[in-house]
Amino acid sequence: MDSTVYSTPPTNSISLAEAIKIAEARFEAAVQGCKDDWHNGNDLVILQDNIPQLFGGILVEHFKRCVGEVCGFPVELTVMDGGDNYHTLVQMPKNNMRSPQVVSSPQSAQTSPSEQTSINLKAVAAGLKKAPRPMNCWIIFRDAMHKHLKAEFPHLTIQEISTRCSHIWHNLSPEAKKPWQDAAQSAKEEHLRQHPNYKYTPRKPGEKKKRQSRKSKRAAAMTTAPEVLQFQLSPKLIPTVPEVTDEPPLAANPVTANGNNACPEDVSNCFDPNVFPEIYPEAPMAADFFYNTESIRHSLLDTEFDIDFNMDTTFALFDDEMLAFRDGADGDATLPSLFEDTY
């Protein structure tokens, strides 16, 4: 269902001739507006006047006849009380021939494979897209009245317009609501024809809250910490590119390897271990470490040989003659009998 709003100028205290002239202009504007709107495919038009009260019985019948000659069917007028003023709803039959048929020529009938592919992709996308829910009578009424009130009162907010639409809808009589109910039924039938497999699937309660909480968290993050998305790289992290200069490179100083070349003093200092600082300084080591290690080794030997392995007692078993290289031995010292050749 489509609807269009047409405004009419307010009445003022004028002469009879001027009033007749203005009334004729308003009458022709209302009729022409309904005709144009019907040709565009709209079947409901809201006028910002009380047409029966403004024109009277004879002109109202003439108005219906003029509009009915275009659509071929009689039209119905419904007066709606808007609180501050009245509005007239013009209900016309649906125009299914609003778009002229274009006869395709043989050249236009031929399409390239790429065009056929794009058409098929569009058809698949349209099929995969979820069909919208058909509008009920209140949604259709609110959509039409929103356009009407927005054109008449541009300063109104969306909430104020919704409040006025709700007030007008509750004040309508059953006869005044009948056109909107018929429009909703027509929209439902058209929706069923376009989407025969449509099934209403309401959104889960947690899905809407999750989406709203996600949006609120994202907005809060953008508000509280905008610098997160507006960061800059540190100069130390930016790779530097060597500058290209016209200066010639430094000449190399070749050194000939011969015996006459003297080694400079500063080069000899490079081999001094005291010049370079210790890269890996040694950690202080306790003296008890060596003692503990030696004690562990002796205990392992005692366990293996089942004797008390003591260095002092071991050397006491040997005589001084057995040690040829003892302190104070002569140069012609002979080996003890333990090491003599016995065969």
UniProtKB/Swiss-Prot annotation:
Listed PANTHER family: SEX-DETERMINING REGION Y PROTEIN, SOX TRANSCRIPTION FACTOR
Organism expressing this protein natively: Cochliobolus heterostrophus (Southern corn leaf blight fungus)
InterPro entries according to UniProt: HMG_box_dom, HMG_box_dom_sf, SRY-related_HMG-box_TF-like
Record keywords: DNA-binding, Fertilization, Nucleus, Transcription, Transcription regulation
Predominant location: nucleus
Keyword DNA-binding listed: yes
CDD domains registered for this protein in UniProt: HMG-box_ROX1-like (cd01389)
Record's protein name: Mating-type protein MAT-2
GO biological process: cell differentiation; single fertilization
